[in-house]
Amino acid sequence: MLSVEYLKELYPLVYNKGIMCGSFAPDEWDGIILELSERISKYLELNPNPQFAVDQIKEKYGGLRFYINCIDDEIEGYIREAELAVDEIERRLKLL
């Protein structure tokens, strides 16, 4: 599992306020969370939002839940793509 400190170091625009309610996700999802964080960071560089914060990253019902404190269609799209990628990983793991 990725630490909040590590995420803050890599993506300060995304995690500058930490993760309000914590992060609880399986290690197998680290790559997807890092890719999502990278995409959000690049977006925030071009579209600054000083109020942006990640509220929580967790597993729920076998899927990724990545909660943020604001509504942004572009970022929400990135999150949906990451959730689908996790669903695919979980589907493949069940086939093994």
What are these regions (language model features)?
Residues M1-G77:
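Long, charged N-terminal interaction/targeting segments
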Residues E76-L96:
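Cys/His-clustered metal-coordination modules, chiefly Zn-binding fingers
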